[in-house]
Amino acid sequence: MNSLVATPPVPPHFYEYSRLSSPHPMSTPTHTPINRKRKADDDGNDHDGRMSASPTNSPAFTPRSLPAPRSFKRSRPNVSGRPLSLPRLLETLDTDALRGILRSMCERHPALADEVIHTSPRPSVSSALQVLRNYQSTLQNSFPLGGNPESDYAYNRVRQPLGNLLDALSDFTPHFLPPHETQASVSLSYLDGATDIIHALPRWHSPQNNIERDSAYDEICKAWILVIREAAKRGGGIQLQYGGWDQKLAKHNQNAGGRLQAAVNELGNSLGWMHGPDSQGYGSSTGGDLVSVREQLLSGTYGLGTPVKVGPW
């Protein structure tokens, strides 16, 4: 008995799926042998790509984060104006500004003045003479152009810088005198330079205007006498004998018009005492011979022209 088996109905959504999906060919596509072969360069490119890929999924390599470079500058997230630090502020100040600030601070705080005096280095002869030369240069630049530089008008124009120079000279000179200064060579070097500065002071027609210049010569003459006496007591007066100070002081006395004659006499007495009683005629031929022999000994030329005897004496 033939029976018909009814085909179960297909749900409608199956038809909808088949309608929306793209149809695929049922037949197996045929490929030519050329398409099935792989080129050698393709294999190489594929191998290079696999080797260059980072093995992020491999358990043998763990990713590490590189340390951040150290920054030597502090981060300043908020940019705003601020005053300079003290070291940077001092770098912008010149010598005159620093001197003025330090002077005002010492005036307001007297205890700070003693600290500055004990902390500051001892002034040298060159630095002190340089300060005096600066005052001297200011004095020379203060003269009026044209006219008579020795007149009363010129004196009134330069009276203030002239007073500043003389005040500085009177302040620096005691600093280089004994007993504050123990080295005779330092004292003599300062007096030599300070006397040259006094020689350069202007001369005036009016005698009353020359009183300050004459007073400066008197003070420097007393300083010379004090230093000569102290130098004669120390080390046998070696600084006076071998420094050529007799000639230097004689030249200063000549430029001063004889106002340093007392210092010249003091130096002559000291050198005469050191040479002994037989050398009363200091500066004579005998004294000149002694000076000549002394200079030869110091220079190492003594006895070079004397023939040397060979054989039994």
Swiss-Prot record:
Stored Gene3D superfamilies: Tethering factor for nuclear proteasome Cut8/Sts1
Main location, first listed in the record: cytoplasm
Record's subcellular location: Cytoplasm; Nucleus
GO molecular function, one term: proteasome binding
Transmembrane segments: none
Annotated Basic and acidic residues bias: 39-50
Low complexity: compositionally biased ranges: 21-33
GO biological process, one term: protein transport
Keywords on record: Cytoplasm, Nucleus, Protein transport, Transport
Cysteine pairings via disulfide bonds: none
Binding partners and assembly: Binds the proteasome.
Protein name: Tethering factor for nuclear proteasome sts1
Native species: Aspergillus fumigatus (strain CBS 144.89 / FGSC A1163 / CEA10)
Gene: sts1
